């Protein structure tokens, strides 16, 4: 069993200690993340570089988040590929080519800016953190990136990491479709990956 982490925040690695105790997977991640998240594991490979396992190539993409060694990933197998990109305030343009025309995207669309700014439950400092370069992609940020990346080989987009208070699935999908339409990009196979359970199993 293989585990590859994106970063060390508790909401992303909080269950690893329990999972590891039962299944003893090999954890492929940076040692700094093991330390930051206080993970009680000894079977890990301290690596944050490109990795090949069987016929799958795993390419880490540095993200901009307030966590040590945060990463998104590109998974390649033959002519098929998946992008997993969440928990980042922006994406460095030097990775645009690597992220373009992939088969499937799992892509952060965290918040609607207006809902976030008008949310009385979020203090000002937290709003600024979310909106900052080390925060999260808004619906509009996400849509503009995806409009650059979606290509003729793209089959599916899952919008992910939606805020329960500052977003909703209909709004995130609508924002993406509007921007794709403005840019004359014909693509509508879009779903939201919810926090309530797994998505359906799909073949790419």
Label the predicted regions:
Residues 93-192:
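Cap/insert and terminal regions of metallo-dependent hydrolase folds
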Residues 46-104, 202-204:
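Core dinuclear metal-dependent hydrolase active-site scaffold
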Residues 22-26, 81-82, 188-189:
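Short active-site oxyanion
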Residues 1-2:
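Short, small-residue-biased leader/transition segments that mark boundaries at the very start
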Residues 8, 32, 63-66, 86-90, ...:
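Active-site metal-binding loops of divalent metal-dependent hydrolases
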Residues 188-204:
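Short, basic/aromatic-enriched C-terminal tail that caps enzymatic domains
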Residues 6-9, 13-67:
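Glycine/small-residue-rich loop that forms an oxyanion/phosphate-binding "nest" at active or ligand-binding sites
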């Amino acid at each position: 069993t293989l585990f590859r982490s994106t970063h060390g925040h508790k909401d992303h690695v909080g269950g690893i200690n329990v999972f590891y105790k039962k299944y003893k997977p090999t954890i492929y991640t940076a040692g700094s993340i093991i330390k930051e998240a206080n993970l009680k594991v000894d079977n890990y490979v301290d690596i944050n570089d490109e990795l090949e396992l069987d016929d799958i190539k795993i390419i880490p993409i540095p993200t901009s988040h307030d966590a040590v060694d945060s990463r998104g990933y590109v998974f390649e197998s033959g002519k098929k590929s998946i992008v997993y990109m969440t928990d980042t305030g922006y994406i460095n343009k030097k990775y645009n080519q690597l992220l373009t025309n992939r088969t499937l995207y799992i892509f952060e669309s965290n918040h609607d800016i207006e809902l976030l700014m008008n949310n009385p439950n979020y203090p000002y400092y937290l709003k600024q953190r979310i909106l900052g370069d080390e925060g999260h992609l808004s619906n509009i940020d996400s849509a503009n990136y995806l409009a650059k990346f979606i290509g003729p080989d793209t089959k599916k987009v899952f919008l992910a990491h939606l805020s329960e208070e500052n977003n909703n699935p209909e709004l995130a999908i609508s924002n993406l479709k509007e921007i794709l339409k403005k840019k004359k990009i014909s693509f509508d196979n879009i779903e939201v990956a919810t926090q309530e359970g797994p998505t359906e199993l799909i073949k790419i």
